[in-house]
Amino acid sequence: MAPLLRVYGALLLVQLLFGLHYLTTQLVVERINPVEWAAMRISIAGVILLLLHRHSIMRWPVGAEWRQVALLAALGVVVNAVFFAMGMERTTPAHGALIMCMVPVLTLAFAVALGYERASRAQQAALVLALAGALVLLEADRFRLTGAYLIGDFLVFISATSFALFLVLSRQAVDRHGAMGLTALVMGASAVAMAPLSLWSGIAHADTWSSLPQYVLLAAAYTIIFATVVTYSLNYYALGRVPSSQVALFIYLQPLIATSTSIAVGRDVLTLRLLVSAALTLGGIALTALSYRSESKGNGNPP
């Protein structure tokens, strides 16, 4: 197989694996407290990723750099995973996938707000479109805050926002430690932080964990191994071989995979509101990606 086909195959596999994890996460948090589940997922996946990719760390942190690693771990892993799990307990896989797909647009918003970038007109339009998509999904047009999935959607939005802020604040750390190296560091630090809660949950609720149905255990194992360890590793494999703009475009597949799977098992219903929200949100992401691609061509850099 040609090298480029292997890369694109890896990216397709990443989106398939990650697209399914909205459903598997929901299956788990229906039986396990979402915060305890997030702690268990982080602890196990963090140790595995650190062991697998410790040699990718270009330079280990020293002194105050550990504080930055701790902050990035809190934003990019702990807050992200905890609020995602809490949100998926209260919303649907289709809603969750659509909101998490706003990460590229939220990243742009933070980069502009913090002075790292200046938004072009196309990027400003992208922010407006994505915001409109979120408001439609949250039923803001009805001027009420009582939607069936409002709380869950908002919790997932906090997760997406936290991860977007992590992406913006991690740029210097990526240069210091390497992309996969930083991931190993923040996952390892997060595993240490969440280990006490994981141990307490495993001991205090041993009966609950041991009596989980087989399908829940399989969903939990899938989420930890395939939707965390494998996807992180494949994503960085691809980032080392094709431009990041091409990697980002594959995120479009997540809502399609998550929604179709969720509808197939009866956990979602395809509505006009969901379609309109998807069109607006994905339109915003498309404008963001195209604007970065245009800037790269104009600067003579690879897209």
State the predicted function of each range:
Residues 1-39, 86, 145-172, 180, ...:
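Glycine-/small-residue-enriched transmembrane alpha-helix faces in small-molecule transporters
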Residues 3-7, 31-35, 39, 61-67, ...:
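Juxtamembrane helix-entry segments on the extracytoplasmic side of multipass membrane proteins
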Residues 6, 30-79, 104-111, 129, ...:
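Transmembrane alpha-helices of multi-pass small-molecule transport proteins
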Residues 17, 21-22, 50-100, 136, ...:
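Specific transmembrane alpha-helical segments of multi-pass solute transporters/efflux pumps
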Residues 20, 24-27, 31, 45-62, ...:
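Membrane-interface helix-cap regions at the ends of transmembrane helices
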Residues 36-47, 76, 84-127, 159, ...:
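Specific alpha-helical transmembrane segments that line the substrate/conduction pathway
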Residues 38-40, 81, 96-102, 169-192, ...:
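Helix-helix packing/entry segments at the starts of transmembrane helices
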Residues 49, 70, 110, 119-141, ...:
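Hydrophobic transmembrane alpha-helices of multi-pass small-molecule transport proteins
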